[in-house]
């Protein structure tokens, strides 16, 4: 079986308008004009089934934009994908927006995990996110835990939130609120984040941050601690590697159906930074056809380090 992680950003609609949004999501509803129709979205589930029938073991994460700006459509899509993949192979990344007890209970029975971003603790000002962004995640955590969901928090580490005080505050909040997993991702200037190159940490800064967090986690005397996972492109821990994962390990699907080899290889207008990263579109070809195509073959055939380099842009992994 060939393992494949797929991140499907279903919509570009989002209430937050974050300064660093990697796909350029917006609260302007006209962004949905280029989005797949519901029928086309549901067809992605059929395409995933075809991958499974042809030797792929697929793990999928649905994200956005904000997935729950359209709860009826996207719960229908999650149901279809859960039936194809099984609950244990399906996850959701969201902000916490729109989650009430009914939606939390649905997610508890349909997906394996729900991950939300918390770069700083609620009510703490942060240059790169709106004021209420962490508050939405915090409110959703309690509802999701009550519904039996596995709950994760993701912190995107940048030069603006990499202090000991910021890291300790988020970790302590996660401990106190029963969060299961704390995932730490390196900030890359992808999408709108390309306008903030100064927010990207160097390899040396990342390594120092990793060691700081590891020591903090080991020494904090609390009863419950979430599992801590560092993204593989953060130097300083045993999982670190800069070997390219494009196509052989993961792909991304954008709201308009474009399939990209490297999810983070997006410019400030959220188009592929180079044509070779654009593999096809699910409206024109199935995922299996795209992965068997010539554009994908380039990535299967090459063995190299991340082309976008250090201070560059890797693909987001859901592994």
Protein language model regions, located:
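Canonical Radical SAM [4Fe-4S] cluster-binding loop centered on the CxxxCxxC motif
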Residues: 1-40, 262-264
